[in-house]
Curated annotation (Swiss-Prot):
Function as written in the Swiss-Prot or TrEMBL entry: Catalytic subunit of the tRNA-splicing ligase complex that acts by directly joining spliced tRNA halves to mature-sized tRNAs by incorporating the precursor-derived splice junction phosphate into the mature tRNA as a canonical 3',5'-phosphodiester. May act as an RNA ligase with broad substrate specificity, and may function toward other RNAs.
Pfam family name, one: RtcB
Reactions this protein catalyses: a 3'-end 3'-phospho-ribonucleotide-RNA + a 5'-end dephospho-ribonucleoside-RNA + GTP = a ribonucleotidyl-ribonucleotide-RNA + GMP + diphosphate; a 3'-end 2',3'-cyclophospho-ribonucleotide-RNA + a 5'-end dephospho-ribonucleoside-RNA + GTP + H2O = a ribonucleotidyl-ribonucleotide-RNA + GMP + diphosphate + H(+)
InterPro entries xrefs: RtcB, RtcB-like_sf, RtcB_euk
Organism listed in the record: Entamoeba dispar (strain ATCC PRA-260 / SAW760)
Catalytic residue list: H447 (gmp-histidine intermediate)
Name used for this protein in its record: RNA-splicing ligase RtcB homolog 2
Enzyme class: ligase
EC number: 6.5.1.8
Sites where the protein binds Mn(2+) 1: D141, C144, H249
Entry's Gene Ontology cellular component terms: nucleus; tRNA-splicing ligase complex
Amino acid sequence: MSSGYKPGKKRKVQPVQPIKKELVDFYGCQIPKEYEPYLQRTNVSLIIKKGFINGMKNDAEMFCNDDLFELLMNELLNEQPGASFSSCVRQTANVATLPGVIKSLAMPDAHSGYGFSIGGVAAMRLDDPNAVICPGGVGFDINCGVRLLRTNLDDKDIEPHLVELADALQKNIPSGVGTTSNQTLTEKEMNEIMNEGLEWLVKKDLAWKEDLVYCEENGRIINSDPHLVSQKARGRGRNQLGTLGSGNHYLEIQRVDEIMDMEAAKQMGISHIGQICIMIHCGSRGLGHQVCQDFVDLCVNQSNKNEVDIQLTGVPFQSDNGQKYFKAMNAAANYAFANRGMISYHVRCTFEQVFKKSPKDLDMHLVYDVCHNIAKEEIHLIDGNEIKCIVHRKGATRAFAPLNPVIPDAYKPIGQPAIIGGSMGTCSYMLVGTQEGMKKTFGSTCHGAGRKISRVKAMKDISSNSVVEEMKKKGIELRITDPKLAAEEADGAYKDVKEVVETCQSAGISKIVFKLKPLIVVKG
């Protein structure tokens, strides 16, 4: 670019003179003329052609409908040198320059993040010894994920207890920035949790054995090494097990609002409109954040920094440091599985307290638990050959096709469930993976609505009081630790989740099964 800066490189913001560029119309949007030869619009995506960024190994692809496409183009048009993050389009192209990359992708909910966009997917082929693993391609909240529990309650059963249940959930499940639980784990317990994940809770009778079956990786990633997790990271996680955190993390009590695929829904134990479910969205808390920070520092301080974007600096997967990060990341991921499991324990106990029935009698079974910030070793069919890859999913959900051997037997006929949370006060969705998704996205789909504006802009433009009042008008019981921050998570700060999941379905990468509507929202 004419300014001479390196796109995406994090640096101190300096005053810059606006750069005047010749603009052209591109499918109803204005873009700099220099980009036009490298962009191609399809009915479900934007193709970023090799050459948009110097060093791209191949084309990149961003899934979008017309409205989401317009957001991407406006962001690209208005990106400024000196910003902390590049535009989502540029970030997706930047990832296509990484060593060993097969393809860089962005899901419809994608928005700018550290290194990879949030919503980014990339697979690196492991028959290339230089193939990298990139902390910026996983994110700071390692194994941020979401789980759904079902019940045999209906909305009419829960309506008289909404206030009582909302108050009890807020009391029993700590939430908010830096929140701690009433339990401080010993060093031995920390090691066990980071090694065993959800299995540790099962041994302690804090989770059901069947929960393991309905959790991605059975709630435990085997190739982990807790001893690679720093004391600083351990200190941050020691008293946070069973806590929700802040930001877009939440616990929601939801009703089934619409069923699009009854056969698939029944396989998940969802039988009718009005059925009550519980959705939990959180990750590895401060422990995972510190693990990421430790290895970002290690990568950035090495001599071979990424020349396109320093935030994409990684290490060869097969190197000593690559394996250290991978195993420490997996240890943090196991902590996250246990964290969601511990919150589920408190949810089950709270329902028992309010409804005077045991969780078993209330049919509080786990439907599924998915990761959406993780890097995994997987085998994918590339140009007719089975290739072992390291697949980065950052703000993206694994959604494997029917009959895949790693998904539970009950779901083999329908494909892996993918749980998609909406913005605060809007609907959420259950999707399943498809064969087309295996071909197009390495078996990946979206993870949520995706931010439309930053938290800072949301706080400036949206009134938190109006958000709280709007939730009341919708009949939603909101429990938020700091109501002043409600604007950060306002519906207007996010894309339309309906458009996101429908775009995924139109692209053939996942299929919508049912929709959920919130009745209670608990946030930090």
